[in-house]
Amino acid sequence: MSESFKKSTVREYFESIVIAVILALFIRTFVVQAFKIPTGSMEENLLIGDHLLVNKFVFGPTAARLERAVLPVGTIRRGDVIVFKYPEEPSRDFIKRVIGLPGETLELRDKKVSINGQPLDESYVHFLEPPGTSSEFREVTSYDVRERYGPVTVPPNQYFVMGDNRDNSQDSRYWGFLPRDYIKGRALVIYWSYDDGLGDYHEESTGEALKGLGSVFVHFFTRTRWDRMLHQIR
């Protein structure tokens, strides 16, 4: 085998690796993101330990009419389950459902949402049972925003988002409207669901993270929620 052939082969391997890395980074940055459900704020639709794929391209900007016609992009609609940067701590990602759109007037009375004076049909909503069960995210306010909020008008280029588990969700009722620029993408599908038994979100040390990986290795088949695999998110 000639020296030039060896160099050519090594170069081809190197170029293939570089291209693969660039492609993976492009997909991760602009197209798809993996996301794990850390809390119960979206129950019963999304459970702690659900691993999702998030379509980041669907809300991406498009410059031309032809691109809008050909590429799978879209506008943000009421009912979309979205992943976004938490406005009060942008390094963290949250997941909620879009309820109020720009320009709409939203009001919450007795836990029922109205948009522009019309009751909203929300079959996906879940409430804590029995009544009076404590909520991790409940805050002390002049009135309980879980029961009553507004009316408020959603500003331009902002959205009002809420968790499906209305009594246990830190959402727009507590921290306000969500700017359009903070939205990263639409939740697409559950590719894996694992019940680690840890409950709601908590900070992990390096040791706990390694212990968690070991637990997944041991309990993968028994704790994986097989019936939730490839479940489309609505």
Please tell me what each predicted stretch does:
Residues S2-R11, F26, F30-K36, S41-R234:
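Soluble "head" domains of membrane/secretory-pathway proteins
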